[in-house]
Amino acid sequence: MSEIFRPPVSRIATLAGHRDAVYALTGGAGSTIYSGSADGMVVGWDAAEPSRDGELLARVENSVYALKYLPALHMLVLGHNFQGIQAIDLAGRQLAHATALPPVAIFDIVYSESRQRLYAGLGDGTLAVLTVPDFRLEKLLRLADKSLRCLALHEGRGELAVGSSDALTRILDLDSLETRFTLGESTNSVFSVVYSGDGTRLLTAGRDAQIRSWDVATGYGLVDTVPAHMYTINHLAFSPDGRYLASCSLDKSIKLWDAATLTLLRVLDRTRAAGHGTSVNRLVWPGTENRLVSCSDDRSLAVWQLEV
């Protein structure tokens, strides 16, 4: 039996400047990342050169939970809680579009290149659909009585996974927005949904601290349940090469897993890896340098280097 390779991981930088908890992260072009926080600041960083100061791109009145980079338009879309969607033209460093939404929190944003549509999960259980590039509100669809917390696209199957605080994950048809499947094994709020790079699996996680793996081809049959953290799992993210899965939690830790087997490889916490001291809220794998970036309630971002 071959020995499991557990890649060494070290914290190589701290990105500081936010004045409150950092909730949102998204990758941009190359090694660029963007962060958003409870202080309403949206900041751009270079994960390849973490010694460089961040660049303030926007400051809005309320908190920011969701960010999405649109490469074809070179725009950064932010969810301005209780206000709506804003799109920043990154070339001109200016606001290009602003679309009002119901006055609730905006928890996640995804973009379908094939449909030219932006989807936003709202705090009142509504899915907002906007057309791109004009960012016109096309539809508001009430899916649940509780918050829609996370979204993931499967472009190949034309499906949208929606995790919510009613403990359900709904799989919608991207065109009709009708529910194809409902996944009900979670025992509490679903905070993260992510498809594997090859599109064969959907992973879900949330307040019950377990990672569940679903087989897409068999109609989302449950294939594995892993007790992964002590407390709420806030986010899951696959590495660009598909080899690793990272999870982060209210328990202040980041965990690195073998993506194929969900075997635990590393725990990145305060004691073992100079990790965050409070809840870790979101993760992103920028660029191609085997780097992982996390953000936390401690107002900072951490840059982690994998030696693979």
Where are these regions (language model features)?
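Short loop/turn segments that connect beta-strands within beta-propeller blades
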Residues: 47-50, 89-93, 131-135, 174-177, ...
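Residue-level detector of Asp-centered blade-edge/turn motifs that repeat once per structural unit
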Residues: 28-30, 71-72, 113-114, 155-156, ...
